[in-house]
Amino acid sequence: MKLNAQQVKQFHEEGWLFLPDCFSPQEVETLRAEAEGIYSVDRPEVWREKSGAPRTAFAAHTYNEGFGILGRHPRLIEPVEQLFGEKLYMHQFKINAKAKFDGDVWQWHQ
């Protein structure tokens, strides 16, 4: 997937880029189901709220096939490489599962 000039300009001016059609609704639903499967398993990479609700799943690309594919998918990787002008690799990957009305706040970040 190649970004157009306007998308590249927006990223450099505003610091973000939203690509709502990058993945199909079916692909998104598949990943949502994969995430639910990850949250249902008790493993050290899945951090939980005091209530037991999942908060974050770290490194899912290393133990889940769906998220492994996502982490290497050209529609995700190629636009980022285009923006940064160099090859990249997955350094950190997490899925935030903050349940509404449950758990601690998320700290501001960039």
Where are these regions (language model features)?
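Non-heme Fe(II)-dependent double-stranded beta-helix
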Residues: 1-14, 19-110
